[in-house]
Every structure is written in C-alpha cells, then in structure tokens.
Amino acid sequence: MRRLAFSSSALVLALIAGCAVIVVPEDGNAQIKSAFSSNAVQGNGQVATEQRAVSASVDGIDINGSMLVTVRVGQAPSLTVEGDSNLLPLLRTDASGGTLRVWTEGGVRTSNPLRVTLTVPQLRQAEANGSGRLQVTGLNGGDFDLRLNGSREVEIAGRVGRFDVRLNGSGSMNATALDSASTDATLNGSGRLQLGRLQGQSLGLELRGSGRATASGSVERLRVRLSGSGNADLAGLSSRDADISTNGSGSVTAKASGALVAGSNGSGSITVYGNPAQRSVSGKRVTVVQ
C-alpha cells in the first residue's frame, strides 16, 4: 500500500507537470516518464577536433542549438568543430547554398561545450536560434544582416557599410568594436543591443518590450520608436535631425542639432541634448536641454 501511495502521488505530479506516460513492468513497479524526460546523448568527456569542408562561396551562417561559434572574416575558408568525440557525429554542418547551417541532431549533454570555428573571406548574414555564444571578427566593409532569436550572447567586430540587426528574446549583442555607416535595429523582448560606432548616414531603432539599446558616433538622421518599458541611451550619438516617439513607460536619451520631432505618450520620457534649431514637441515628458 505504501508503494501504491507513492506511485499515485508521482502520477499526480507528472500529470500536473505535463503529459505523462505510465510504464508498468511485470514486477508491478510503475515508472513515470514525463514529456520532459531527456533522451539526450551524454558526452564521453573525450574531446576531439574535426576539420570539415567549406567553400569560399559561403558568406552566411545559420546556427540552431546551444554551442560556441566563432566566425573569422578575411582569410582562406576553413571549418573546425570540437566537442566530445561521441557527440561530433551529432553536430551537423551543411555548407550548400552559400550558407553554413549548424545544428545538433537530437539532444546532447556535456560538460565540454560544442565549438564551431568558421573562417570565410566575406560574411553577409548570420542567424542564430537558441542559447550559447557567437563571435564575429574582421568584418571588412560589406553590408551585414544579423538575426537573433533566444538568449544567445553575440559579439561583432570590424567595419560594415550597412548593419541590419533583429533581436527577439533575452539575448544580447555587443557591437562596440563595430564601425558602420548606417544601422537599422529592432529589439523585441528583454534583450540588450550595444550598437557600436556609427559614422555617416542614419540610425533607425525600434524597441518593443523591456530591452535596452546604446550607440555612439555621429549620423545625419536618427529615428527611434519605443513601445513598452525599454530604454534607449543614445546620448553618445550625435545626430543632425531626430524623430523620436515613445509609447509606455520607457525612456529615450538622444542628441540633435538640426530638426527635432519628439512625442511622448504615456509615462515614458524623452530627453534631447544639443539645442536643436527646429523643434516639434508633444507630450509632457519631453525635455530639450540647451
């Protein structure tokens, strides 16, 4: 009876947690396997390295899963993967179509992170889903598109003409070592964008949620749209003309010297430095500092 009571309690807990499968062997000892039971392959602790083929035509990367990825731009193409020797066959790579796809086949468990190192002459785009880290160095003047979904940490360095970044989730991007002439950035969620040094045309920034964004440098045009409780600290970015609006409790700090259009709806605030020559301001919480 005592064993039956325990099994019943476990069954209730499993059903509360989610779908449960009841397995009753011949000895009568019920086993409960929930939908969250892991079938992941355990790493054997024996770290190995593999060289894999990649062509010079690859100029993009698509990452799915938890791994540490490094992309180096500007040298002869190469691809190296590292991890527990029994997990490397599950770390899949496909370089067809000009984009390197990286993913794990099924679940894995290991104390040694899976590592991928890619070297390519050019990198035009990167997409990453899930957790882990992505580091890109040596960007060399072309346009670059970045798409992030999840909690991944990303570092970007080099020089680009146009930078287009979209972040969904709680991840973070540090581009303080990146120089760009024009940037378009969108953040949905609680993540963080450090947009680096802009020098030239424009910054377009959209924040939805509780995320944060920063930028430095100098641009001709600044456009900011903020919805929610987020924060855009752009006081380190000089702009000639600025168009800023907030909806919610978030805040924007910016700098403009030419024409300013600013509107605040809700409890959020806008603070603009630089004494802009032309001003069109609406909302009680818009402040222009001389």
Positions of the model-derived regions?
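Intrinsically disordered, low-complexity terminal regions
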Residues: 1-290
